[in-house]
C-alpha cells in the first residue's frame, strides 16, 4: 500500500495543495487564491478546510509546507515572508499540527522546489544537483547525496545574493550587484523600459498595446523570437549575469546537474545560450564539462511535490 503525503506551496498569488504518493506522483490537487492581506489564522483555517475535501486525506501521513521567506525549519516558524506581509513569527508547524493532528514540516520555497526537482527531474539520473529558481527573485536549493543541504541556520542556497557585478545595482538585502538585481522579473522588465527610452523596438510596445505595464518576460520572449533587438539585448544581458552566477555554482559545488525553474527559465535558449557562453569562459573546465544544465519539465509542480516530500529530508 502506497504512503501518501500532503504538500502545500504557499505563493504570493496562489496556494497549491496536493496529495503525493511515495514515488512523488500527484494523486489529488487543488489551487486556492492567496489573500496577502488576510491574517495567518484565517489562511491556516482556509487551507486546512481544503485538506479535508481530498478523498485520500485520511491516508495522509505527514504535511509539508513551502513558503518564501526567513523560515526556522527546525521549529516550523515563519519568521518573515515577503509574499505575506502579515506573517511575522508565525508558528505554522504548531498551528497546523493542532488542527490536523498530523506531523508538519515547514521550509523555504526554494528548498522545496529543489526537492521537487530532484524527485521529478533528476532522481533516476544523479545524486547531486542545484536547483536555481528564476522568478520575481532568484533562489536556490542544494541537493547533496540525495538530501537537501540547509546549512547551519537553514539559509544555504541564497544564490540570488551572490555578487555578479561589483558595485552594481543596490539590492533589497543591502548588498550591491546581487544576481537577483539582474535576473529577477522586476529588474528584467525595468531594464526593458529603460532601454525603450533610447532604443527603437519593433515588437515590444506593439505586443504590449503601447502599455509598459503589460511588459512581461513572456512578452519579451515573444518579441525576441520575432527578432526584436531590444528584447534580444535584455535576454542576452540577463543570460550573461546568469552565466556568471552559474559559473560560481559549478566551481563551488561541482554538481551533476543544475536545474533551472520558474518563469524566467521559460525563456529557454534566449537566456541559456549567453549563460553557457559565460560558463565556457569562466567556470573550471573539468567541472563545467561534468555539469548538465536543464530546464525543469515540472516547474508548476516542483514546490508542492517538494513540500510533500520534506518528510524524506
Language-model features, listed with the residues they occupy:
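Structural signature of FAD isoalloxazine-binding scaffolds in flavoprotein oxidoreductases
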Residues: 155-158
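Short beta-strand segments
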Residues: 9, 64-68, 131-137, 141-143
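A charged helix-plus-loop insertion that forms the helical arch/lid used to bind
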Residues: 78-89
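Proteins enriched for Cys/Gly/acidic motifs involved in redox and nucleic-acid/cofactor modification
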Residues: 113
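ATP-binding/phosphotransfer module of carbohydrate and carboxylate kinases, centering on a glycine-rich
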Residues: 1-62, 72-77, 93-102, 116-126, ...
Amino acid at each position: 500500500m502506497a504512503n501518501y503525503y500532503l504538500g502545500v506551496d504557499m505563493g504570493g498569488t496562489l496556494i497549491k495543495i496536493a496529495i503525493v504518493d511515495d514515488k512523488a506522483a500527484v494523486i489529488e490537487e487543488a489551487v486556492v487564491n492567496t489573500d496577502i492581506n488576510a491574517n495567518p489564522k484565517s489562511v491556516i483555517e482556509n487551507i486546512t478546510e481544503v485538506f479535508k475535501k481530498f478523498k485520500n486525506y485520511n491516508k495522509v501521513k505527514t504535511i509539508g509546507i513551502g513558503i518564501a521567506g526567513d523560515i526556522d525549519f527546525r521549529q516550523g516558524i515563519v519568521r518573515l515572508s515577503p509574499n505575506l506581509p502579515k506573517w511575522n513569527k508565525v508558528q505554522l508547524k504548531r498551528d497546523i499540527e493542532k488542527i490536523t493532528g498530523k506531523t508538519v514540516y515547514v521550509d523555504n520555497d526554494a528548498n522545496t522546489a529543489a526537492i521537487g526537482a530532484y524527485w521529478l527531474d533528476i532522481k533516476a539520473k544523479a545524486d547531486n544537483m542545484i536547483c536555481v529558481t528564476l522568478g520575481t527573485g532568484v533562489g536556490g536549493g542544494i541537493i547533496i547525496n540525495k538530501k537537501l543541504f540547509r546549512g547551519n541556520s537553514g539559509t544555504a542556497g541564497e544564490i540570488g545574493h551572490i555578487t555578479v557585478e561589483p558595485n552594481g545595482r543596490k539590492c533589497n538585502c543591502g548588498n550591491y550587484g546581487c544576481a537577483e538585481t539582474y535576473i529577477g522579473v522586476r529588474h528584467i522588465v525595468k531594464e526593458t523600459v529603460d532601454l525603450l527610452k533610447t532604443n527603437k523596438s519593433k515588437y515590444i510596445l506593439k505586443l504590449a498595446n503601447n502599455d509598459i505595464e503589460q511588459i512581461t518576460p513572456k512578452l519579451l520572449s515573444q518579441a525576441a523570437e520575432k527578432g526584436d533587438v531590444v528584447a534580444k539585448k535584455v535576454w542576452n544581458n540577463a543570460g550573461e549575469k546568469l552565466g556568471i552566477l552559474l559559473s560560481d555554482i559549478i566551481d563551488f559545488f561541482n554538481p551533476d546537474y543544475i536545474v533551472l525553474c520558474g518563469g524566467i527559465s521559460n525563456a529557454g535558449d534566449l537566456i541559456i545560450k549567453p549563460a553557457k557562453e559565460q560558463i565556457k569562459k569562466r567556470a573550471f573546465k573539468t567541472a563545467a564539462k561534468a555539469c548538465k544544465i536543464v530546464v525543469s519539465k515540472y516547474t508548476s509542480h516542483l514546490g508542492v511535490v517538494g513540500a510533500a516530500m520534506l518528510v524524506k529530508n
